[in-house]
Amino acid sequence: MIPGEYHVASEPIDYNGGYEAISLEVKNVGDRAAQVGSHYHFYEANEAGLQFDREKARGKRLDIPAGTAIRFEPGETKTVQLIDFGGKRRIFGFNNKVNGFLD
């Protein structure tokens, strides 16, 4: 290996493989932009500004690479893909709507 050299996979990385995604339309009705990160419990995201079917979003997060986010500008409507939280499916913090097991 040469210093600074990268060895990358020849195939695309399936970063959220094995999870079934749902589509959800989201509208920002607020007067400021809202940004939601990759591992935020979408059900609890910005109740004042973002309008969407919250029950469909319960237990789900954005289907985007870790460490990234989606930004919703005021008045903007976007369709996002959501996937289930994995692991033991326990949610703590965020806006304190669950604080325990999802199932």
Curated annotation (Swiss-Prot):
Superkingdom in the source lineage: Bacteria
Keyword vocabulary terms for this entry: Cytoplasm, Hydrolase
Gene Ontology process terms (BP): urea catabolic process
Keyword Translocase: no
Catalytic activity: urea + 2 H2O + H(+) = hydrogencarbonate + 2 NH4(+)
Subcellular location: Cytoplasm
Induction info: By low pH and excess glucose.
Keyword Transcription regulation: no
pH dependence per the UniProt record: Optimum pH is 7.0.
Thermal activity characteristics from the UniProt entry: Optimum temperature is 60 degrees Celsius.
Pathway per the UniProt entry: Nitrogen metabolism; urea degradation; CO(2) and NH(3) from urea (urease route): step 1/1
GO molecular function: urease activity
A GO CC annotation given for this chain: urease complex
Enzyme class: hydrolase
E.C. numbers: 3.5.1.5
Family: Belongs to the urease beta subunit family.
Protein task: Ureolysis may allow urea to be employed as a nitrogen source for growth and produces ammonia which may protect from killing at low pH.
Quaternary organization: Heterotrimer of UreA (gamma), UreB (beta) and UreC (alpha) subunits. Three heterotrimers associate to form the active enzyme.
The protein's name: Urease subunit beta
Taxonomic path: Bacteria, Bacillati, Bacillota, Bacilli, Lactobacillales
Gene of this entry: ureB
